[in-house]
């Protein structure tokens, strides 16, 4: 499935990003500032754990009755004059949207931020038929004009770029001549994008939450770009993962409140856009034609399994914003559009273990992600389940790990081998030990001892010590 954003071995990507001092500083700053803002709005709301439990109940109930609510949504969209397409795969979703673009003879398409269109790799499909696709979220716009640089964060896709880098991109691609002042950069982008809104044939959006009872879709933004993407083009296409649905507006209000506080530390974002089908007669704006593409792309295979809780995700990135591993390696190290703890759980499920078998190990299992999640996804537990599957079912554990575990099993199962090993260990590790500590370990211990020390094996075994004590001796 077309989710990969980076090629090359996982550890090579990690090493490269560990050497990126700006990226690491930007991520650390984002996490620290976000923590303070989030804590403030959570305390102001009050009863946060009760809110989390309510949000969890809403998501669980919806997933347990997903077929009913998807059918209700589909019927209500159709009643409003919209078209609904259920896409089992990324290819089916892309082909449907491609056909709509060809039918409308579209030359220009404007898009608001959408993770699922990144997931299915939609843009190249439309560009291949001659459409100019313009991302209108400022972060996504910056990445697009910078030769399609992939996003590194679910909410802040251009987090890995500083203002000087963005200025250079604007100078190179847009003829920008002013300073690196963020206000000037944003003003220039706004002027460029305004022309695209007015001349676009099709608008494409993602979906934060679809409302089953009304056939509406909601979009949560701080830039207002979704308003223009849905209001100006004659044809509107919304692409949503099949799990991004709630029964009524009441549930949507709860989840939006949790989303905005968890994602950006705000009570509400600047804009919440609600779109319900094509424009009615007499309306002055809105699309003449509306299409809703509901994407499966592996999600149905997660339903009913031990990993079903991951589909509760509302894409707030709260788990990413507290993750100590993400803090050091950034988003591109994950090799998937979904980074951080949620990406480490979701990417192997949607993209397979062959490409993402390392991600469940990119975690300290500190459970900060689970505590931060506003819908109570047990992320650290799901990471452990992935590790178990990788070893037991998939057989994809590293060769060194397999050999080490086999040797450990044989040694602990045989008393004679165990005694021999405990006698040999002090001599074997002596060249690497100093004052009873191993500071530069061999083999698998090398990476471990780069950031911590390892206790050297004792010269006197516990069994020998105990026997001496039993005989009334003076154990050392």
UniProtKB/Swiss-Prot annotation:
It comes from the Bacteria. GO terms for molecular function: 4 iron, 4 sulfur cluster binding; metal ion binding. Pfam families: Fer4_8, LUD_dom, LutB_C. Transmembrane segments: none annotated. Residues 440-476 are annotated as: Disordered. InterPro entries: 4Fe4S_Fe-S-bd, 4Fe4S_Fe_S_CS, FTHF_cligase-like_sf, Helical_ferredxn, LUD_dom, LutB, LutB/LldF, LutB_C. Residues 467-476 have a biased composition (Polar residues). The keyword Secreted does not apply. One of its GO terms (biological process) is lactate metabolic process. Residues 449-466 have a biased composition (Basic and acidic residues). [4Fe-4S] cluster 1 binds at residues 313, 316, 319, 373. Keywords: 4Fe-4S, Electron transport, Iron, Iron-sulfur, Metal-binding, Repeat, Transport. Belongs to the LutB/YkgF family. Is involved in L-lactate degradation and allows cells to grow with lactate as the sole carbon source. Has probably a role as an electron transporter during oxidation of L-lactate. This is Lactate utilization protein B. It comes from Geobacillus kaustophilus (strain HTA426). The lineage of its organism: Bacteria, Bacillati, Bacillota, Bacilli, Bacillales. The gene is lutB.
